Amino acid sequence: MMWPPSLLLLLLLLRRGAQGKPSPDAGPHGQGRVHHAAPLSEAPHDDAHGNFQYDHEAFLGREVAKEFDQLTPEESQARLGRIVDRMDRAGDGDGWVSLAELRSWIAHTQQRHIRDSVSAAWNTYDTDRDGRVGWEELRNATYGHYEPGEEFHDVEDAETYKKMLARDERRFRVADQDGDSMATREELTAFLHPEEFPHMRDIVIAETLEDLDRNKDGYVQVEEYIADLYTAEPGEEEPAWVQTEREQFRDFRDLNKDGKLNGSEVGHWVLPPAQDQPLVEANHLLHESDTDKDGRLSKAEILGNWNMFVGSQATNYGEDLTRHHDEL
C-alpha cells in the first residue's frame, strides 16, 4: 500500500469542490498510513502446477502481463532474448545475467508506476519547460498564483491552506538535496513518493506525528492513535476492531512499552522493514533456470526456461519491447 499522497494532491481535490476536509489516510481503519512495498504480483506463486503468472508479472510488471497473449511463442522468445541482452548491457556486459542484474531488472520493472506518475506530474509542474521543476512552479501550479501577503485571501479556511503550503514547501526543501530550489526528476520523485527514499524517512515520520499528535507533546498516545482510526458517534458502541487496534498499539507499536509512540516507533510502524521482493524473485528465477549451477544465467539458459520468464498466446507476454528503451 502506498504512502498517502502529499497534502498538495489533497488540495487539488479540495479546490475542485470536494466537501469537507479529507482524511489524510486512504483505506480502512487508517491503514493507509503504513507503507508496504506493493506485491510483485497478486497471482498465486504456483510454479508446481505450471502456473507462471506470478513470475511473468514480477519480471515484466502486472500491466505489461495483459499484453502477453498477443504474441506467438516464437515472437515471445525473440523478445525475451532482447530483454536478456538489455539486462546484461545494463550491468557489466559480460554476456551473462548475474543475480544482481536480474534483481535490478525486476526492481526497475516494479518501479514503473512511480515513474509514470512522476512523468505526469512533471508535465503539470514544469510550466516553463526548462527540464526542472522549481518550487515556485510547483506552488503556483498547485495552489494558484498569489501576490505576497495575499495568499488564500479568496478561499475559506485560509489558515488550513497556509499550513498545507508550508508543509509541502518543507517536504520540497528536503527532497531538493542540492538546495537550489529546483527539483530534478529524481528530486521530484522523492517529493511525491518520499517513502521510497531513505533521506525522506524523517519527513514522513514528522508529517505523521503532526497529523496524530493532537496535544503536541511530541508523542502519539494510544487515544490519539485510536482517534485517527475511529470517531465514535453519540450512543454508538465501540466496534470490536477498535479494541483490537488498542492491543496492536500496546503489543506491537509501542516497542519500549511506555504507553506512547516516539518518532522511532512511528517510523517502525509507518515505514516497516521490508523484504527485498525483487531479490527473492531473482533468486527463484536463477535457481529454476541455472542448469549448470554456476550462479549466473546464460542467454541459452533463460531461453531454455522462457515460459517461466514470459509467455505467449497460451500464457502471456507484454509491451516491454514495444515501448521505447528510455521508457523502461
UniProtKB/Swiss-Prot annotation:
**Sugar-modified residues:** 140, 262
Q: A Gene Ontology MF term for this entry? A: calcium ion binding
Q: What is this protein called?
A: Reticulocalbin-3
Keyword vocabulary terms for this entry:
Calcium, Chaperone, Endoplasmic reticulum, Glycoprotein, Metal-binding, Repeat, Signal
Q: For Ca(2+) 5, which residues are the binding ones?
A: 254, 256, 258, 260, 265
Q: Which residues form the signal peptide?
A: 1-20
Q: Please state every residue range assigned to the domain named EF-hand.
A: 75-112, 113-148, 163-198, 200-235, 241-276, 277-312
**Lineage, highest ranks first:** Eukaryota, Metazoa, Chordata, Craniata, Vertebrata
